């Protein structure tokens, strides 16, 4: 019980108060002005010699508290240039202020947690989205069942604010935040709730990403607690966790109750080979045991979203599949567990035995059809995968055209170098290479054959295929045999922090 008390006090101490005064700190908007905003946004319709002023922020906040803040006469803009109602300026400057203020305490908390765990030096590698694949290669070959889950979006912005309210105790700050969201919803009252959230995410990306990420973080914190204590919980006891305010007190009580009354069933609900992976709004659950426990976790998620977060989910979209028969999509790869069968001959005295050995290996495959669809959308090929010229780039110089294609090819090759089968990757390189040649031929108003014969660009365009070998030769300069082995194997680059647009198929 002392351990839970320490955790409770630690979480309480991390609750940040008095965020409201930070709204009026000029350095907060200086950060927004320097990093995220186009400078013209802050000076539009203002006329302060192209300098933003804290007085603007104070006046905007005052207007939000007024009852008639939505009613602005046509003559107001003539009396004072500031009172000219500019929706983008009004929304963005306040939204950016909210985002920066609310990020400050949680960033400090995150930095301190990294220092406590002593993982500051390896943090850059942990940030890589490809750092999850070595984990999958190590764990998933021993698992049998997988479930692909899409985390549902909240239907209203107020839900996101309520989740944040449990961690930050500052009534004036949340009152102002609610006024801001209420003002936004009124200005877009003709939109459905789903479209309203989509519009808000585009017009206020930083604030929306923080609120959504915090919603996912809160959902995962409850899920991880349930995972750790799953040996003490049964499905009917799950409803006691829905009031977040008394969460930790109930946790202490439940551990005592279940340790006394359900000690005989502890081992039945324990699942040591159960793994969870998430990227953005998509999560993967995998387990070695029978689908019974996977079904229980499926119901846990549904009740958690609907009862605690007021988010409607579709149980029919959550399927439990066998890893050996089905693949799952994550981070631009189709992954599944492949069975490798080999026969070993063993001889003992006069007898000879043939032993069949079955080993499992995680296969990561490049999804060639979605990538061709993305390349067709970007006008590099048609829907069948036949390369076409990029006519929009025909006005650039030959060097710029080749450099653009090489950059795209380099990024895709860098990203998909972890594929088990390189054939699809070579096809993508071929499409980009031929599209580059057709673009150059279109620029010079010639056919592909005539252009190559006249300019002799074949050697230059070979960089599409030789660049990967050059990178490996820099990493392993004296090991030619190592290069030959690595050429057909998977290599995960831990400097990839995000995927490009051609990889985002969903």
UniProtKB/Swiss-Prot annotation:
Keywords: Chloroplast, mRNA processing, Plastid, RNA-binding, tRNA processing. GO terms for molecular function: RNA binding. InterPro entries: Domain_X, Maturase_MatK, Maturase_MatK_N. GO terms for biological process: mRNA processing; RNA splicing; tRNA processing. It is found in: Plastid, Chloroplast. Pfam families: Intron_maturas2, MatK_N. GO terms for cellular component: chloroplast. Transmembrane segments: none annotated. Usually encoded in the trnK tRNA gene intron. Probably assists in splicing its own and other chloroplast group II introns. HAMAP family: MatK. Belongs to the intron maturase 2 family. MatK subfamily. PANTHER family: MATURASE K (PTHR34811:SF1). This is Maturase K. The gene is matK.
């Amino acid at each position: 019980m002392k351990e839970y008390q320490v955790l409770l006090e630690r979480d309480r101490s991390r609750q940040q108060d008095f965020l409201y005064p930070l709204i009026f700190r000029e350095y907060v908007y200086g950060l927004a002005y320097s990093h995220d905003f186009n400078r013209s946004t802050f000076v539009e319709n203002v006329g302060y010699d192209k300098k933003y002023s804290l007085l603007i922020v104070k006046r905007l906040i005052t207007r939000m508290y007024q009852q008639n803040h939505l009613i602005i006469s046509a003559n107001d803009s003539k009396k004072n240039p500031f009172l000219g109602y500019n929706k983008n300026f009004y929304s963005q400057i306040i939204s950016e202020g909210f985002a920066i203020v609310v990020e400050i305490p949680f960033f400090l908390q995150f930095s301190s947690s990294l220092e406590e765990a002593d993982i500051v030096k390896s943090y850059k590698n942990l940030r890589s989205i490809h750092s999850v694949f070595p984990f999958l290669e190590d764990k998933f070959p021993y698992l049998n069942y997988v479930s692909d889950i899409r985390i549902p979006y909240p239907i209203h912005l107020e839900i996101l604010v309520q989740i944040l309210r449990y961690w930050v105790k500052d009534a004036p700050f949340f009152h102002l935040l609610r006024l801001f969201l209420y003002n936004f919803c009124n200005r877009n009252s003709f939109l459905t709730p789903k479209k309203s959230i989509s519009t808000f995410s585009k017009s206020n990306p930083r604030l929306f990403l923080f609120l959504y990420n915090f919603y996912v973080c809160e959902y995962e914190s409850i899920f991880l607690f349930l995972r750790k204590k799953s040996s003490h919980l049964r499905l009917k006891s799950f409803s006691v966790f829905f009031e977040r305010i008394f969460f930790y007190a109930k946790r202490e009580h439940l551990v005592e109750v279940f340790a006394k009354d359900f000690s005989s069933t502890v081992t039945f609900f324990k699942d040591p080979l159960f793994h969870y992976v998430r990227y953005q709004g998509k999560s993967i659950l995998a387990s070695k045991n029978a689908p019974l426990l996977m079904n229980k976790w499926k119901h846990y998620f549904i009740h958690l979203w609907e009862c605690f977060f007021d988010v409607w989910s579709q149980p029919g979209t959550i399927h439990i599949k066998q890893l050996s028969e089905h693949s799952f999509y994550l981070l631009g790869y189709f992954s599944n567990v492949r069975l490798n069968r080999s026969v070993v001959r063993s001889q003992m005295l006069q007898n000879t035995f043939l032993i069949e050995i079955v080993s499992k290996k995680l296969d990561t495959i490049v999804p060639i059809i979605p990538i061709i669809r993305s390349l067709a959308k970007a006008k590099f090929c048609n829907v069948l995968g036949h390369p076409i010229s990029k006519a929009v780039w025909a006005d650039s110089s030959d060097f710029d055209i080749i450099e653009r294609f090489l950059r795209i090819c380099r990024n895709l090759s860098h990203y998909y170098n972890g594929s088990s089968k390189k054939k699809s990757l070579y096809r993508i390189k071929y499409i980009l290479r031929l599209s580059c040649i057709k673009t150059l031929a279109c620029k010079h108003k010639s056919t592909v054959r005539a252009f190559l014969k006249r300019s002799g660009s074949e050697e230059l365009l070979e960089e599409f295929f030789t660049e990967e070998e050059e990178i490996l030769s820099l990493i392993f300069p004296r090991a030619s045999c190592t290069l030959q082995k690595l050429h057909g194997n998977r290599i995960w680059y831990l400097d990839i922090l995000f995927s490009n647009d051609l990889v985002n198929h969903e």
